[in-house]
């Protein structure tokens, strides 16, 4: 998962290369960038980082991305494949000028094997799921005939209920914005 099935746009490739060098760490990519339902310059790129020092990595990400700590979300995630519970942090980074969106998840190194098992399990989808995801994304990204709410609702049904048979247990906790940032 250090490489991707689909070619990243050149800006995204350069972004991850520079950030990987800056952090002295590897990215592991998952989600649509690894599947047939990836839409270049529309789909976000999901990436995992594993580290022994999450707080240090978050500080480095803050510096590189030019974001505040409260923009990171803490989360708890129940992995279905290994029945483990992991904790981590997530940042959604948007560069509108380059039509680039990424979600980077930061986990402790000890959870790496379990998280990768979970994420690899959704790299190869049944044909009918891929087909419906491509139709859904075409309606949303290319034709603009469905709302973000509708898109998210049906994607959740396809990816969670039709693959896992249940909802993904993922709880995000926003880090509150300090009063002096307002």
Identify the residue ranges that each predicted region occupies:
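Catalytic core of pol beta-like nucleotidyltransferases
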Residues: 1-18, 23, 34-42, 51-182
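Acidic Asp/Glu-based divalent-cation binding sites
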Residues: 44-46
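Glycine-rich beta-strand-to-loop/alpha-helix junction loops that act as flexible
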Residues: 30-32
């Amino acid at each position: 998962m250090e490489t991707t099935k689909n070619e990243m746009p050149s800006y995204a490739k350069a972004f991850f290369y520079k950030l990987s060098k800056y952090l002295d760490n590897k990215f592991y990519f998952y989600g649509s960038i690894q599947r047939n339902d990836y839409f270049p310059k529309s789909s976000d790129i999901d990436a995992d980082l594993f580290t022994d020092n999450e707080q240090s990595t978050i500080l480095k990400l803050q510096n590189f991305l030019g974001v505040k700590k409260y923009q990171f979300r803490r989360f708890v995630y129940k992995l279905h494949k290994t029945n483990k519970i992991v904790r981590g942090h997530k940042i959604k980074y948007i560069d509108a000028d380059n039509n680039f969106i990424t979600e980077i998840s930061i986990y402790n190194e000890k959870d790496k094997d379990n998280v990768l098992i979970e994420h690899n399990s959704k790299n190869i989808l049944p044909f009918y799921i891929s087909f419906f995801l491509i139709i859904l994304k075409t309606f949303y990204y290319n034709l603009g005939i469905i709302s973000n709410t509708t898109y998210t609702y049906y994607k959740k049904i396809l990816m969670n209920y039709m693959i896992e048979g249940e909802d993904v247990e993922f709880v995000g906790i926003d880090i509150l914005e300090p009063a002096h940032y307002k």
